[in-house]
Amino acid sequence: MKRILLLLFIVISSSAFGQKDTLGQDLDTLYGIASYYSPHFDSSKTATGEMYLHSKLTGASNFYKLNTWVRVTNLRNGRSVVVRINDRMARRMAAKGRVIDLSRSAAKILGFMKSGLTKVQLVRVPKGTKK
């Protein structure tokens, strides 16, 4: 009986603490930390095969399918911008609580270039949404 209880405890514990794969789940709303791309990534290839350009309003996220449009709102100042997800983040960034890595243009609009990180809300929006 003790062995059965121990085995049951191990199974339940391992499933409760197992890491969930969130790659491309397309959540409607998500909260977390945003960062922005380093300048040395300019013109590098993204997960969609296109080149990353700091002047475009794009982002990398493991929580949305590629080519999903999301409104990103900086919770510290209320500014928002709509970006298209065209890349994936390194898993180590997601492990640090980051939900999106934005282009430099998007980070400028949101007003967190100096701090480098900010708390954000992400909301999935229809393709082509401007605001």
Where on the chain are the PLM-derived regions?
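Sec-dependent N-terminal signal peptides
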Residues: I4-S13
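Positively charged n-region of N-terminal signal peptides that target proteins for export
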Residues: M1-I4, Q19
